[in-house]
Amino acid sequence: MSTEKFTITEHLVPGSHIREYPGSTVNQEDVLKIHVKQYTPKREGPVPDDAITFIATHGVGLPKELYEPLWDELLDQASGFHIRAIWMADVASMNQSGIHNEDKLSMDCSWMDHARDLLLMINHFRDQMPRPLVGIGHSFGGNIITNLAYLHPRLFTTLLLLDPLIQLSPPSLGFGTDAPSAINYTLWRDDVWPSREVAIRANRAIMQGMDPRCLDRMTKHFFRDLPTPLYPDVEAIKALFGTTADSTTTPVTLTTPKYHELVAQIRQNFNARDPKTGRIEVPRDTHADMDPLVAYIPLYRPEPRSTFRRLETLRPSCLWVIAGATFLNIDEIREGVKICGSGIGGSGGVPDGRVREVVLPGFGHLMPFQEVKTVAETCIVWLQQEMDRFRQTERQWKEDRDGKSHLAVEENWYKVLKPIPSGRKKRNDKGKL
C-alpha cells in the first residue's frame, strides 16, 4: 500500500492565470485551485543527489489515486536509480481539484491549461525538485506532459508516455458523434446511484481486469457521496430510487461530473455556421484552434493533432509504452514515435537512441491499472539507461566548467570576433536613435 511505502503530503496551489478558453470558468478572473499529492518514499539515510522527481499526469476523469500501485511498483523495482518524490495533480475540473473549484467551473476545458498549471506547481515547489525531473503521463495526461515539455524544453530529463493521446485523427469508437463512442457513453451514462455498492456494480465493466489495489482505490475515489451542487437534494434522489428517507445508505455520484469529463474529451463547435447565411466562419475569439477546413463539424478536439505536429521538436528523450489493444489509433501513434525528437531542437529521436517504443500485446488503454507490474518494469528498463546517461552528462559538464571564469567570456570570443581597426573614423550617427 502506498501509505506504507510513501509519506503522502497534500497541497492546494493556484492554477495559471487566464485560462485557454474564456468559457472554462464562470467568470474569467476566477482563481482555480489545483489539488496535489506528493509521494515521498519512506527511507533511511540521505536522499542521493541524483534521485528522480517524477511529475505525473492522469487520464480523463481518472482519480490520481488509481496510479498509486504503479508508484509502489516503481519504488519496489527501482534499480540503478532512486526516487526523490512523485508529484501528481488533479486537472482543475476533475477529481479533488474539481471539488475545490466546483463553484467556479463552467462547460469548457483545454488540455493546455493543466500543462501551465503544472509548470507553476513545479516553480512553486522548486526547492523540493532538483534535477533530474521525469515526466510520466497516461492517456490525455501523456499529451499534457508532452506539452509541458514543449513549454519548457529542458525541464525534463526524459518522458514516459503511457498510451498517450497524441495522434492526427480521432480514434474509431472514440470521438465520433454516432454511437458507440466514448463521448456518447459519457453524455448518456447514469451518474447517480442509491449507494456506493450499487454504483460499483453498475460500473463493473470499467473496472474489469483491474489490479485489486487499483480496484480498491477506484471504489473509494471514483464516486462521491451526495449532496453535491449538481445533486443537492438527497431526499429527492432517495425518493427517485425508492429508498426510505430514514435509510442510512447514502446516494453517490461521480467524483468528476460526467459533463466535465465530456468537455475534456471533446469540444463543441456549435456556432461556426451563421444561421442566416449558412456560411461557415471560425469564431476566432473562442475557437482559434479550430482548423478552418473542417470548421463545419460540430465537435472537435485540437490538442491530439497539434501535439503530434510538434513531435519533431520534443527535447527530452521519450519512451512510448503503447497498449497493443488500445482503442486509440495505434498506427498513427507509432508514426509519431518515428518523428519524435528528430527535428531542430529535438532529442535526436529514434536514430540517436533517444526515443523508443514498446508495444505491450493484448493490453488495453487502462493498462496502468490492469498490468501494473509489467508497465512498471517497462519504465524501469528505460529509466536505468537514461539515468546512466544523465550521470555521465553531469560529470562531463562539471569537468568542462572546472576552472572557467564566470566573470568574463572565454578566449574564443576574441578569436572569433575581430577587433575594430585602430584609427577608424567614428561613424556619424547624428539624427538616428
From Swiss-Prot:
Q: Name one GO molecular function term.
A: polyketide synthase activity
The cysteines covalently paired via disulfide bonds are none
Query: What Pfam families does the annotation carry?
Result: Abhydrolase_6
List locations, semicolon-separated.
Answer: Peroxisome matrix
Active-site residue numbers = 139 (nucleophile), 163, 365
Q: What is the effect of changing residue 163 to A?
A: Loses 49.5% of the acyl-CoA thioesterase activity
Q: What happens when the gene is disrupted?
A: Retains the ability to produce MPA, albeit with an about 50% lower yield, and accumulates 2 compounds (MFDHMP-d4 and MFDHMP-d5) with an even shorter isoprenyl chain than MPA.
Q: Which reaction does it catalyse?
A: mycophenolyl-CoA + H2O = mycophenolate + CoA + H(+)
Q: Give GO cellular component annotations, separated by semicolons.
A: peroxisomal matrix
Sites binding substrate sit at: 60, 140
Q: Which GO terms describe its biological process?
A: mycophenolic acid biosynthetic process; terpenoid biosynthetic process
Q: In which pathway does it act?
A: Secondary metabolite biosynthesis; terpenoid biosynthesis
Which key words tag this protein in UniProt?
A: Hydrolase, Peroxisome
EC number(s) per entry: 3.1.1.-
**What's its job?**
Type I acyl-CoA thioesterase; part of the gene cluster that mediates the biosynthesis of mycophenolic acid (MPA), the first isolated antibiotic natural product in the world obtained from a culture of Penicillium brevicompactum in 1893. MpaH' acts as a peroxisomal acyl-CoA hydrolase that converts MPA-CoA into the final product MPA. The first step of the pathway is the synthesis of 5-methylorsellinic acid (5MOA) by the cytosolic polyketide synthase mpaC.
Per the record, the similarity remark reads: Belongs to the AB hydrolase superfamily. MpaH hydrolase family.
Q: What is this protein called?
A: Type I acyl-CoA thioesterase mpaH'
UniProt lineage: Eukaryota, Fungi, Dikarya, Ascomycota, Pezizomycotina
